Structures are given as C-alpha cells and as structure tokens.
Amino acid sequence: IKDFFHGLFTWNWSSENWHSTVMAFKIDMGWFQGNFGQILSRFTWELPQTLFGHLGSQTENLFEGVKSVSYYGGATAVETYSAKWGGFTLGSFIIGHRGLHADPNNSLFQHEYGHYLQSRASGPLYLGKYAIPSFYDTMFGRGNHKYHSVEQDANARAIKYFEKRIPGFADRRNKGINEGWDHYNYPI
C-alpha cells in the first residue's frame, strides 16, 4: 500500500518503488513454506513465536529494511540491509544481517535454523525456554554468547539435521571446502 501511494503522489512508478511490497508478499508466503506438518505446526503448536516472527519481519520491511527473502526446509530467511549484527529466529522466521540466505552453507542460516528446530520441538515453550534466555544473554552476557547452552543446543540440532540430509556436511569446511558446518563461528 505504501508503495502504491508513493507512486501515485510522486508519479514515479519504477520497479524500485515496489521492492517493499514484493518483500511483504514474500514474508507472508513464509507462512506456507514447507511440508504439511510444518505449516500445520506454524498455525497451532508454534503460533505465538511465529506471530512475533512475522510481525518483526513485516515491521523491518515497513521501514524498508528488508533486502531479500528466501526459503529452505520450512524456514523463511529475511535478509536486512544492516551489516554484521547477527540474527534471531521466532517460529519459522529468521531475521538476520546482510548476507543471510536460506542456504545450508550460509553460516548464519545454519545456526538460526537450529533455533527454528528448537521452535518446532518445544512449541509454546519456545519463547521462555529458548528465545528469551538467548536474547537476555546477547544483551547482558559476558561476551561468550556462542557458548551459551541455548546456542549450543541450536548448533547441535542444526548440524544433526543437515548431516542427515547432506552426508559429510559436518566435516566439509575442515577439509578446506567452503561449504558445510562453520565450526569456527558456531562451535559444538
């Protein structure tokens, strides 16, 4: 809607003016990514955190902060224009810094996908058991956030998930291949 009125009042109908509208649509389509079980879970078991994730994604987009939206394995990755602040996951919505893409070889996505797996497993307990403690540690921890138990659990879940689907995934970077699990940034 914002893009329509901008074009109407400025008579500038270039494709750049429709970027946030396209991103809003892609964010909305995130509700319907994945298999039937993932979609059903999103509307029931994971509904509280999914609503917050969708709201956060659309709010970022409202202020023209969303660069791209991509999907993988039921998750929606929302890439922002901001550099190197990290990311956070609420339900199936992963919001992260510039460079985030829904790709198993994307280091930030790997880790955040682990939080999505936590959400799927814990349902309505996710916010209290994982999201809030992780956020609190990010804000008030002693600088070793990647070793916090919630983060370690996310890493363990994600590496197990990806290793099951991509044989040898856990060791590829150790062999000098620029794909697979990023052990340096996301240790187990």
For each predicted feature, which ranges?
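Extended, hydrophobic alpha-helical membrane-active domains that insert into or remodel lipid bilayers
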Residues: 1-37, 103
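Polar low-complexity intrinsically disordered regions
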Residues: 1-10, 114, 160, 175, ...
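Metalloprotease/metallohydrolase-associated module, dominated by Zn2+-dependent proteases
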Residues: 23-67, 74-85, 89-91, 98, ...
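Short pre-active-site segment immediately N-terminal to the catalytic Zn-binding motif
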Residues: 86-87, 94-110
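Acidic active-site catalytic centers that drive phospho-/nucleotidyl reactions
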Residues: 111-112, 151
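Catalytic Zn2+-binding segment of zinc metalloproteases
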Residues: 113-132
